[in-house]
Curated annotation (Swiss-Prot):
Signal peptide boundaries: none
Active-site residue numbers: S12, D189, H192
Membership in a protein family: Belongs to the 'GDSL' lipolytic enzyme family.
Pfam families xref list: Lipase_GDSL (PF00657)
Cysteine disulfide links: none
Native organism taxonomy: Eukaryota, Viridiplantae, Streptophyta, Embryophyta, Tracheophyta
Record's protein name: GDSL esterase/lipase At5g45920
Keywords: Hydrolase, Lipid degradation, Lipid metabolism
Length: 241
């Protein structure tokens, strides 16, 4: 049996997910020998740019569907929600276009792999004070390039698209704000995830995968475990697996 694949498609929060304590690395550990995490994270990207490159990001489907991934996570919105009149305005995507871009990405994935589970993840909350302390480009306005209120609008839009498309969604924006002192507990720079924030994403995505029948208990290992190897005839165990 070939090991299943799970694609992680998103912006920098996905690109960094294989770092120490990252949510992608934790998923890889949870499903080791059962599913491979395929990282497709692109720092700074919004849904407009993601839609532009989506055909280059994912492999062409085989005719028999045998290469279909078990799941794809789609995690965009933090950059779309940049305010258009502020220092990162070039990353901004209007809310109505954000929703349409998400629909188009979901439609692309459904057409390519009809049996693949798709999980949307909302943008995280924003700590505006920290964004002023950790700007990524010159910011002379004294105003944050993102606000938590606007991030919440994009989170709600993401949830609406998931409901419309009848797919799973993780409401990260709401979930993180349930944690005391989330601004410093879940985020290290007002946007990107701390170790605690990564743990939240990992647990929420693992929960959604389980609901889709892609949990650690649901997937088989791809070759015999050491305890399944017959000490008297080791090679026979591989023939019978």
């Amino acid at each position: 049996m070939m090991r299943r694949k799970i694609f992680l498609f998103g912006d920098s929060i996905t690109e960094e997910s294989f770092s120490d304590g990252g949510w992608g690395a934790s998923l890889a550990d949870l499903l080791r020998r059962k599913a491979d995490m395929v990282l497709r994270g692109y720092s700074g990207y919004n849904t407009r740019w993601a839609l532009k490159v989506v055909e280059r990001v994912f492999p062409v489907a085989e005719e028999d569907g045998g290469d279909s991934p078990a799941a794809v996570t789609v995690f965009f919105g933090a950059n779309d929600a940049c305010l258009p009149e502020r220092c990162s305005g070039f990353q901004h995507v209007p809310l109505h276009e954000y929703k349409q871009n998400l629909r188009s990405i979901v439609s692309f994935l459904k057409n390519r792999w009809p049996q693949t589970a798709i999980i949307l993840i909302t943008p995280p909350p924003i700590d505006e004070e920290a964004r002023l302390r950790y700007p990524y480009i010159e910011n002379t306005t004294g105003l944050p390039e993102r606000t938590n209120e606007v991030a919440g609008l994009y989170a709600k839009a993401c949830i609406a698209v998931a409901e419309e498309c009848q797919i799973s969604v993780t409401d990260l924006w709401s979930k993180m704000q349930q944690i005391p002192n989330w601004q410093t507990e879940c985020l290290w720079d007002g946007l990107h995830l701390s170790r605690v924030g990564n743990k939240v994403v990992f647990e929420e995505v693992a929960k959604k995968l389980k609901e889709e029948g892609i949990g650690a208990e649901d997937l088989a290992v791809d070759l015999p475990l050491i305890e399944d190897v017959d000490p008297k005839d080791p090679l026979k165990s591989f023939d019978e697996f």
